[in-house]
Swiss-Prot record:
Gene name linked to the record: zitB
Gene source species: Yersinia pseudotuberculosis serotype I (strain IP32953)
Name assigned to this protein: Zinc transporter ZitB
Keyword Zinc: yes
Keywords, sorted A to Z: Cell inner membrane, Cell membrane, Ion transport, Membrane, Transmembrane, Transmembrane helix, Transport, Zinc, Zinc transport
PANTHER family the UniProt entry points to: CATION EFFLUX PROTEIN/ ZINC TRANSPORTER, RE54080P-RELATED
InterPro entries recorded: Cation_efflux, Cation_efflux_CTD_sf, Cation_efflux_TMD_sf, CDF/SLC30A, Zn_transptr_ZitB
Keyword set includes Zinc: yes
């Protein structure tokens, strides 16, 4: 690992740790304040801050575990733990949303007294904490770490939750209309639900070793046949992801090359540069696949592909 990469990882870890500590501290403070003031909006925003803490923790663990080398028992390393943590966090957040909405409906029809002043103070403090965390995560001009960017987006979305709690507090202080509290708590819960559901689907997809959603495997197979002359057919394609690393195995029927290793390198380079697949295991075959399972993930070149090949 290059020295610059090591310093970058250390910088990411420090910033994520600071943001995680601040967010978690204010999450606990907001939960206590919401319970004491009777504000469901604050409790809903606490759930939203929990999504931020979870996202920051996952990002922090991803940076940490990505520096661990694989061992004989964990040949891909430990990056799958972050995916498992994301799945558990998302499932817990969905449960929190259900509880908040249930309580909001109950509160709307049976209003409770809400202490507007403590609610407003805590909401403002939470907003300032989120602004500071967002600034910490975005500090630096050449930030490229996808985990840090994703965590920053979570914090940014939580700003809306803090603003919602502030609006509810101001309305209660000026008009005494307490139903605004459960109404805004439901709106905040919708934000939580959207993030939690997306996280649940993505983590579940990765745990099932699904292919990265942004890669069209049919297009990938055709691209290999079209852009690499010797490749006649692609089949037995398997693509999955561990953390941020994409892995692939495939069988390629090829014209017998003069240099086997050079052709293999060209295929792997193409997958790396066009699809960011950093680890590809390619089995090259000189005969057409004739076994019953050859149709699995199989692609033949376009009709016009070999018409453009000229043989001396």
């Amino acid at each position: 690992m290059a020295v610059s990469a090591i310093f970058s990882q250390d910088s990411n870890s420090k910033r994520l740790l600071i943001a995680f500590a601040i967010t978690t501290l204010f999450m606990v403070t907001e939960a206590i304040g919401g319970w004491l003031s009777g504000s469901l909006a604050l409790l809903a925003d606490t759930g939203h801050m929990l999504t931020d803490s979870a996202a920051l923790f996952i990002a922090l663990m991803a940076v940490h575990f990505s520096q661990r080398k694989p061992d004989p028992r964990h040949t891909f390393g430990y990056l799958r733990l972050t995916t498992l943590a994301a799945f558990v966090n998302a499932a817990a957040l969905l449960l929190i949303v259900i509880l908040i909405v249930w309580e909001a409906v109950h509160r709307f029809f049976s209003p409770h007294e809400v202490m507007g002043t403590p609610m407003l103070i805590i909401a403002i403090a939470g907003l300032l904490a989120n602004i500071f965390c967002f600034w910490i995560l975005h500090k630096g001009e050449e930030e490229k770490n996808i985990n840090v960017r994703a965590a920053a987006l979570h914090v940014l979305s939580d700003l809306l939750g803090s603003v919602g709690a502030m609006i509810a507090a101001i309305v209660i202080l000026t008009t005494g209309w307490t139903p605004i509290d459960p109404i805004l708590s439901v709106l905040v819960s919708v934000l939580i639900l959207r993030n939690a559901w997306r996280l649940l689907k993505e983590s579940f997809h990765e745990l099932l070793e699904g292919a990265p959603q942004e890669i069209d495997i049919n297009k990938l197979r055709k691209d290999l046949c079209t852009n690499i002359y010797e490749v006649r057919n692609i089949h037995h394609v398997h693509l999955w992801q561990v953390g941020e690393q994409r892995l692939m195995t495939l069988h390629a029927q090829v014209i017998p090359p003069l240099d086997h290793d050079a052709l293999l390198q060209r295929i792997q380079d193409y997958l790396l540069h066009h699809y960011r697949i950093s680890h590809a295991t390619v089995q090259m075959e000189y005969q057409h696949c004739g076994t019953p399972d050859c149709g699995i993930n199989q692609a033949a070149p376009a009709d016009g592909h070999h018409r453009h090949h000229h043989h001396e």
